[in-house]
Design a protein with these regions (language model features):
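Conserved donor NDP-sugar-binding/catalytic core segment of glycosyltransferases
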Residues: 1-17
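A recurrent flexible, glycine/aromatic-enriched loop bordering the glycosyltransferase active site
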Residues: 31-55, 67-68, 74, 116, ...
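A short, conserved alpha-helix in the catalytic core of glycosyltransferases
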Residues: 50-52, 56-61, 66-93
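Short, hinge-like loop/turn segments at secondary-structure boundaries
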Residues: 16-22, 104-107
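Non-catalytic, C-terminal membrane-associated alpha-helical segments of glycosyltransferases
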Residues: 111-114, 118, 122-202
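Short, flexible active-site-adjacent loop segments at beta-strand->alpha-helix junctions, enriched
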Residues: 4-7, 27-29, 48-49, 92
Length: 202
């Protein structure tokens, strides 16, 4: 189960919209039966504010030993596959947000692309993120038009940075290791990486 995250008081308009978009005021419980309806959002989870039933966590071997990020999504996906349910509790609230620069968003989405490249079974079983990404951009522009129109150029630049970072991350094995480390937000991840066409974390 994960709770609701609200933006910090000093959050910029992009950070405010991101939290409003991803963390609604309505609680929900999702299971394998919801995959067709929610797609990859079925396994949305955030370790910034989450708890796992220990018995189930240990039954499914816990978090993967070597993943660049999104171990929370990984575990939620394993739980759904095993027939368990995951919950979002909107009544449990914390403040958590980041005022990322376009460069930092590029790095974060590069790492997200690496994660999906190394765990392709998640998108294979739950669907891709393209549709959700388009819905996010549309919602963001509408939010900014109403609340902070001068931030729209920054939003467009950030969207391009995310897209480029994600696409490069999905094809990280075609890049020099030094380039991957430079593009990545989590530099230490690359210390023990070896190239492999079959490298998949499951």
């Amino acid at each position: 189960v994960c709770g609701r995250q609200l933006p910090h008081k000093d959050a910029n308009p992009l950070a405010v919209h991101a939290r409003n978009f991803n963390y609604s005021s309505k609680s929900i419980v999702k299971s394998k039966a919801d995959i067709e309806k929610f797609g990859i959002k079925t396994v949305f989870m955030s370790n910034s504010f989450a708890a796992y039933r220990r018995s189930v966590f240990e039954e499914l071997s816990g978090f993967p030993e070597h993943t660049i990020l999104a171990e929370d999504m990984f575990m939620a996906a394993k739980m759904i596959q095993a027939g368990y349910k995951v919950a979002y509790c909107a009544e449990a609230v914390v403040r958590h947000s980041h005022n990322y620069t376009p460069r930092e968003e590029f790095q974060r989405y590069f790492d997200t692309g690496v994660f999906h490249a190394c765990s392709p079974w998640i998108q294979r079983d739950f669907g891709g993120a393209g549709g959700e990404g388009f819905r996010f951009v549309k919602s963001e522009i509408q939010f900014l038009l109403k609340n902070a129109p001068f931030w729209i150029p920054r939003a467009l630049l950030t969207t391009f940075a995310k897209f480029l970072g994600y696409k490069l991350g999905k094809h990280w094995q075609s890049l020099p290791l030094s380039t991957c480390r430079y593009f990545s937000m989590y530099k230490s991840y690359w210390n023990n990486i070896q190239y492999s066409s079959s490298k998949e974390i499951k």
